[in-house]
């Protein structure tokens, strides 16, 4: 660590914010927080010579593990109880191109790699079978529904597979050419949200949302389509949609370049689909309008991965952004590479590993800190080196070029401190 004191330490001090300060001969002063880090980082080592640190997908299983797709490196897993990484879990060469999505049941993992789905036995950690969608196209997402059927999205439409007599068989295929009322808005589909309570699937795409409503037998009754409309104020910000999560009756949807969308469906008596939407992005404090992964926490607030990691306060309707100095694995987070566990911890994968954390009720935590003056300059020269002990300053005419320096003397996440000031009897 280039910022740490190396040797010949001559003084140690613990300040009011639990920062430990260490001074050393000819080595300056170093400080570090002694508090537990809010963001915990797990670094990923490449699983092969051509491997990558990049986490391409994440999936939490009720067995207490987060299963992780490692680009060019198969599947690894993280024990959420012991907070330990187990690598490798399954690094069969068939998984090496790129794991795009993972699902699981009590006995198996289902892992999509390009154009195939591989079935891994949990106990032996070996691939026991595989199958391919009829379209033989690149797979973007797979999801198990209430009936333990596997839905697959590609750029050639939507397919559904069911296990029969030990074999996974195609039972449904839907495209933009399927007759109504089961026609999709487009063949180019991205991520699937399975709403088990309402027995329906909501799928993001390059042409808005497709909402599949199922009956009690699991048959698709209709597909409702929702698209952006530039003529209305409460519209989706874009039709090019990716990550999706839900809280109560509200869907939170990430876009590539058009921010975060809040979507509520309206079920009209005549069956016509409608919705209301609001969108948020850079104007509300986001670091970017690319929202590549979305997770709603236990308090109803939304965490977004993309360019760094952002927290969206749904009450204030503002973003708070976090970066490397907050302990993140890097500046880049993967597309839909996130999940949440049974305890409410959130996991976000990126270019060098992943971060996990337990959201709090209020983030960031507000605190009133006293500002201390530290230096005063007049025409570029230090005039009063002991300004912190001075109650008043007199600036004689015509000196009108001066600078005042101040600090809170708090080193607890100083990168997130914000200051406000006003001139009395001048500023309103």
Where in the sequence are the language-model features?
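Carboxylate-rich, polar loop motifs that coordinate divalent cations or form catalytic acidic clusters
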Residues: 1-428
């Amino acid at each position: 660590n280039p910022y740490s004191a190396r040797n010949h330490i001559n003084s140690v001090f613990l300040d009011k914010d639990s920062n430990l300060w260490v001074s050393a001969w000819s080595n300056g002063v170093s400080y570090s927080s002694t508090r537990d880090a809010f963001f915990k980082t797990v670094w990923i080592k490449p699983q092969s010579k051509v491997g990558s640190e990049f986490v391409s997908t994440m999936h939490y299983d009720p067995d207490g593990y987060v299963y992780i797709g490692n680009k060019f490196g198969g599947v690894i897993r993280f024990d959420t109880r012991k907070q330990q990484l187990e690598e490798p879990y399954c690094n069969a060469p068939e998984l090496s191109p790129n794991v795009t999505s993972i699902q699981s049941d009590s006995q198996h993992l289902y892992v999509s790699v390009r154009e195939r789905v591989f079935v891994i036995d949990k106990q032996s950690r070996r691939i026991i079978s595989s199958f391919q969608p009829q379209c033989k196209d690149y797979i973007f997402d797979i999801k198990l529904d209430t009936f333990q059927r596997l839905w697959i999205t590609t750029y050639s439409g939507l397919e559904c597979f069911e296990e029969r007599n030990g074999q996974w068989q195609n039972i449904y295929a839907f495209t933009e050419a399927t007759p109504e009322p089961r026609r999709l808005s487009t063949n180019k589909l991205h991520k699937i949200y399975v709403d088990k309570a309402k027995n329906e699937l909501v799928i993001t795409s390059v042409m808005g949302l497709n909402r599949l409503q199922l009956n009690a037998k699991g048959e698709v009754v209709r597909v409702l389509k929702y698209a952006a409309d530039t003529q209305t104020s409460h519209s989706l910000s874009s039709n090019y949609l990716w990550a999706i999560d839900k809280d109560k009756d509200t869907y939170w949807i990430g876009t590539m370049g058009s921010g975060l969308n809040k979507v509520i469906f309206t079920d009209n008596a005549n069956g016509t689909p409608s919705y209301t939407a609001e969108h948020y992005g850079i104007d509300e404090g986001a670091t970017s309008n690319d929202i590549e992964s979305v997770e709603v926490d236990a308090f109803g607030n939304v965490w977004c991965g993309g360019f760094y990691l952002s927290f969206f306060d749904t009450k204030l309707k503002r973003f708070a952004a976090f970066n490397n100095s907050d302990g993140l694995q890097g500046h880049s987070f993967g597309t839909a590479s996130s999940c949440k566990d049974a305890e409410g911890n959130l996991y976000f994968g990126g270019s060098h590993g992943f971060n996990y954390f337990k959201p709090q009720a209020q983030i960031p935590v507000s605190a009133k800190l006293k500002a201390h003056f530290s230096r005063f300059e007049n025409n570029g020269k230090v005039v009063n080196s002991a300004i912190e002990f001075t109650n008043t300053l007199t600036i004689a005419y015509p000196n009108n070029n001066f600078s005042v320096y101040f600090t809170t003397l708090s080193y607890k996440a100083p990168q997130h401190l914000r200051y406000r000031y006003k001139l009395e009897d001048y500023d309103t």
